[in-house]
């Protein structure tokens, strides 16, 4: 089973050539690119007022049959103005949240008591399903932006349950009969209606403005422990062209990754052995190239999916599909890897040498004699080519030397060949 995967990776390398368009079918950021979600038309606004908004990305499984394995996952964006509160709620989903910018006070109301976390940019936290929580932007001059991966418990939709009624949202308590309510609260229904459900005094929405005194009171009880951060103190990969930080949430089977690429840098061709990656652009502009097989009528061919991505865009990368990212400007993004346990990043190019973390898998793992059987060049020359890069993972994305005419002719001859086996 490894051979088709390896061949797919090798063929991806050819896609970076000058005559790329000749040998592979391409999809740009248009309607027929199932992996690209534009920030302009892929987000649905659930709530919006002068204090902030809540948006959810289009369902992955409704976008393409290729994304059916993501039917239980949704991406949620939250933004709030300074000194605001997202009213207490719970949901039939687990959340893994990342603070994109600003700071937050996040309160989790549990049977054993309430825990308030102080979160800064790039901090992450898991909210268990059914946990009542509320969220505060304590700053007086900076917006709070959060991205959440939601993992549903009751398929297929996710439902937020708010304790209180607003002009935009009804309290779920209101759904109970008066006999249930008066017995549960040990109070007459008139009092319950006046205190909980009266229209007078209702908030306009689920994001409201609050005073500095309440913020100071909650801040005194907040703690920063038991949360994880994607900050620079925990870098896993770093060089002059970029850096990467990973956090694995084993209980959720999710890999959370933060990547920064310098302008002109290239995140070299690689793939994830098992994880399906949901990439969310935080800042900057980049080009994404993804190569995968597609069945079209009775023929098989490789297809290239390209997109120029910027802030708010989302790109999904299926497991084992090779891809590369080139930074047009300084760019950073967060990604959620689904099926993360026992996942490996397989780099197809990069620094060669003895087997180790810095190596690409081709030069480190394939015998030169085998390389000679795989490619037109000699095994020794092919191995030297794969070892020619002096950096790993992040490299200079520009190479200006023109291809030799004979090399261009060889590239043209690749037209019409089939891609990976699909079965």
Curated annotation (Swiss-Prot):
InterPro entries documented for this protein: Cupin_1, RmlC-like_jellyroll, RmlC_Cupin_sf, Seed_Storage-Functional
Record's keyword terms, sorted: Glycoprotein, Seed storage protein, Signal, Storage protein, Vacuole
Signal peptide: 1-21
Glycosylation sites: 28, 243, 332, 390, 396
CDD domains tied to this protein: cupin_7S_vicilin-like_C, cupin_7S_vicilin-like_N
Pfam families noted in UniProt: Cupin_1
GO molecular function: nutrient reservoir activity
Residue intervals of the Cupin type-1 domain: 35-193, 228-383
Record region (Disordered): 397-423
Compositionally biased tracts (Basic residues): 414-423
Subcellular location(s) per record: Vacuole, Aleurone grain; Vacuole
UniProt GO cellular component terms: aleurone grain; vacuole
Domain of life: Eukaryota
Similarity annotation: Belongs to the 7S seed storage protein family.
Quaternary structure note: Homotrimer.
Functional note: Major seed storage protein.
Protein name: Phaseolin
Organism from which the protein derives: Phaseolus lunatus
Higher taxonomy: Eukaryota, Viridiplantae, Streptophyta, Embryophyta, Tracheophyta
Encoding gene (name): PHS
């Amino acid at each position: 089973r490894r051979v088709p995967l390896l061949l797919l990776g090798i063929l991806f390398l050819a896609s970076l050539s000058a005559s790329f368009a000749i040998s592979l079918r391409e999809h740009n950021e248009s309607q027929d690119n199932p992996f690209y979600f534009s920030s302009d038309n892929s987000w649905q606004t659930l709530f919006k007022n002068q204090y902030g908004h809540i948006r959810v990305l289009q369902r992955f499984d409704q976008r393409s049959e290729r994304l059916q394995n993501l039917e239980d996952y949704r991406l949620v964006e939250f933004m709030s103005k300074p000194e605001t509160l997202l009213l207490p709620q719970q949901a039939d989903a687990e959340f893994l949240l990342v603070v994109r910018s600003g700071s937050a006070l996040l309160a989790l109301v549990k049977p054993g008591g309430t825990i308030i976390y102080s979160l800064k940019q790039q901090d992450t936290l898991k909210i268990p399903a059914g946990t009542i929580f509320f969220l505060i932007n304590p700053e007086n001059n900076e917006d709070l932006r959060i991205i959440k991966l939601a993992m549903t418990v009751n398929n297929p939709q996710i439902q937020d349950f708010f304790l209180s009624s607003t002009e935009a949202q009804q309290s779920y308590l209101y759904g109970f009969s008066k006999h249930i309510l008066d017995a549960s609260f040990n109070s007459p229904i008139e009092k319950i209606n006046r205190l909980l459900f009266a229209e007078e005094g209702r908030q306009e929405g689920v994001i409201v403005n609050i005073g500095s005194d309440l913020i100071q009171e909650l801040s005194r009880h907040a703690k920063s422990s038991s949360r994880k951060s994607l900050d620079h103190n925990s870098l896993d990969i770093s060089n002059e062209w970029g850096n990467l930080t990973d956090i694995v949430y084993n209980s959720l089977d999710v890999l959370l990754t933060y990547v920064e690429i310098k302008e002109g840098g290239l995140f070299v061709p690689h793939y994830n052995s098992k994880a399906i990656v949901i990439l969310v652009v935080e800042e900057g502009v980049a080009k994404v190239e993804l190569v995968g097989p597609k069945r079209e009528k009775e023929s098989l061919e490789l297809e290239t999916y390209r997109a120029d991505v910027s802030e708010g865009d989302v790109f999904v990368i299926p497991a084992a599909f090779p891809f590369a990212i080139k930074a047009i400007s300084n760019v950073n993004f967060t990604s959620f890897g689904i099926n993360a346990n026992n996942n490996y990043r397989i780099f197809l190019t990069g620094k060669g040498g003895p087997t180790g973390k810095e190596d690409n898998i081709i030069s480190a793992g394939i015998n030169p004699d085998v390389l000679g059987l795989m490619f037109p060049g000699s095994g020794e020359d092919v191995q030297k080519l794969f070892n020619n890069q002096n950096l790993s993972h992040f490299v200079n994305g520009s190479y200006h030397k023109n291809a030799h005419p004979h090399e261009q002719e060889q590239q043209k001859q690749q037209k019409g060949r089939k891609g990976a086996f699909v079965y």
